[in-house]
Amino acid sequence: NKETKKSNSDSSKKKFTVGFDAEYPPYGYMDSDTGEYTGFDLELAQAVCDMEGWELVKTPIEWASKDAELNNGNIDCIWNGFTINGKEDKYEWSDPYVNNQQVVVVAKNSGITKLADLKDKYVAAQSASAALQLLQKGGDQEKLGKTFKEIQEFPDYNTAFSELEAGTVDAVAMDVGVAKYQVNNRNNNYVILDENLNSEQYGIGFKKGNTELRDKVNADLKKLYDEGKVDELAKKYGIEDMICLGDK
């Protein structure tokens, strides 16, 4: 079922293959009603494809394998809540389009109200995520991370939240948009700490050297922003206050 890459000269539609984490709402996830992959980033990618006459191929990836998928040519880009900061030189980036923060989620009745309360606690994060990198050696919050009892890595945030619900971890470090989605969909038994771990921005990451495709998608993104499509989708997914495309 592997998609074959088509060249531009192919008479059929050009395929635009987007790599994404399939458990990363509201950016990319499986809609349980339709059984289809959807989300803010995937709908935005579809809008670009509609402009270009391309066929969107949605390719779920293991987040820890994203670089291999990109470098092997299995995907054209990584488009899924992808943090630019600290990785500026590793990819050909689109303009930043979402302002993001890394935050910490805890159970409402945990007694944890600030970052300092995480001392000697078990904290979960996704493997190869921006949150994990922040808290590990060399990260901006390395000092905080060292106060934890342990940082536990999970392949996706649904698993991390299951551990939080079970009480095997005390907190989850994650992106604010995903955190809000999870908190709202879990009977509000959880809270996001007021103190952020950082502020950062999302971009679309293309393989180094692939400036042609990056430039094309970037131009389309600007057009979609000017036409109001980006804000329309952002409202649909509850992240309208996080869009930064118009900021200069």
Name each region found by the language model.
Residues 15-38:
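Short glycine-rich His-centered loop
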Residues 1-15, 244-248:
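Short, low-complexity disordered leader/linker segments with a strong preference
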Residues 46, 55-117:
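Acidic, polar ligand-binding/catalytic clefts
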Residues 30-31, 45-54, 131-153, 183-187:
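Ligand-binding cleft/hinge of the Venus flytrap
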Residues 42, 57-68, 151-163, 200:
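Short helix-initiation/N-cap motifs at beta->coil->alpha
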Residues 42-51, 112, 116, 121-122, ...:
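Extended ligand-binding regions for polar small-molecule ligands
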Residues 65, 81-90, 134-137, 162-199:
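A ligand-binding cleft/hinge motif common to bilobed small-molecule-binding domains
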Residues 22, 99-106, 176-180, 184-222, ...:
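Periplasmic-binding protein-like
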